């Protein structure tokens, strides 16, 4: 019998995609945005989908009426309170968890894990979620709901076949250290076989993005690796956007706000090309307006990394006698 999985903060389902591809039964996704939930439903037709604020969600709303007992709970609470890319991040790390309204969503994830009592949970976020006193605070919170042994697993998506850099933290009651897959996948290997978006095709989310003549002229002058926009994140760190991608290297980290310039053409990448940089298959679709589609791509767990994690979770469950 397949292992049952619930995805909290499911987004478009990148995290769930990896588990589904590894044979898990994705029974429920929860997201508070209706159009994002539509994306999830379009990709997981047999799953239930709840459009719900997780702060209002109780385990009894989920377990008996919808899915029964669950084996695995995964989720990606918003990273904005913790990421260094947010210039308005609170200076005190504990304030990010306990006082920031979005940061407190992590605590609601922990609450639901305690109520649902899965055999394994995996929570994804930026590495800064565990910096300073936050690591010990999170250990205490998980211990309080019945999980005294918690592992802070740092993984790089590019080690598992994702064509872009991405260092992320996966907090779990299982140790997750999948072996790296080997050779890295470059930008041109990821997107080079796609037809021009202006040509006839039937590839979803692969539409040309209009640019003003002024912006078109400016990006035409960019060389590989150069950026049109620079901005300051938390503590003055500089970030770049509208980067012309180097075709023979990995792409930079894909964020919801990221827009990339094609290596050889004076245009922005389409949503589909950006999804390719995250390892999404072309049959994984994104609903809503274009900016929301980009958000869904950039906020996802890359499916190749998710599948490597799913493989480790399955191994841990069998080793622990649950499989």
Name each model-derived stretch:
Residues 26-27:
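Short beta-strand element of Class I
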Residues 60-70, 80-241:
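Class I S-adenosyl-L-methionine
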Residues 33:
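Conserved SAM/SAH-binding beta-strand->alpha-helix loop
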Residues 206-323:
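C-terminal target-recognition/interaction regions appended to catalytic cores
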Residues 9-10:
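Class I SAM-dependent methyltransferase "Motif I" SAM/SAH-binding loop
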Residues 52-57, 155:
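Conserved SAM/SAH-binding loop
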Residues 40-49:
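Short, conserved SAM-binding/catalytic segment
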